[in-house]
């Protein structure tokens, strides 16, 4: 497997985890750049070119609510996980735990 193929698989796995991490972090309202920093601090480094389209898609799908904050010098769009987003985050969290357990069981079988 070439290095670029390997990196592609890692990127695909990480992209899926960004959805869950974003939904969980945005239970407290936040804006895009702040979320980028939070994701990086939590071990999910993300590119702005990945995050902003994701936020728009999740909003369009009803998993995020948003509003503009114009109180500061520069208007910022704040996002918050919607009720549907909380349900999705709960389901995804359970699924990730099940996948981690299944993966650990496979690892145990190898030994």
Please state what every model-predicted region is.
Residues 61-74, 80:
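Beta-hairpin "wing" of winged helix-turn-helix
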Residues 75-92:
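Basic, amphipathic "hinge/linker" alpha-helix immediately C-terminal to the N-terminal HTH DNA-binding motif
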Residues 10-52:
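N-terminal helix-turn-helix DNA-binding core of bacterial DNA-binding proteins
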Residues 48, 74-75:
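Short, aromatic/basic-enriched loop-to-helix "N-cap" motif that marks the start
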Residues 1-11:
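Short, Lys/Arg-enriched N-terminal segment that forms or immediately precedes the first helix
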Residues 87-111:
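Amphipathic alpha-helical dimerization/coiled-coil segments
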Residues 51-61:
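Basic amphipathic alpha-helical segments that dock to polyanions
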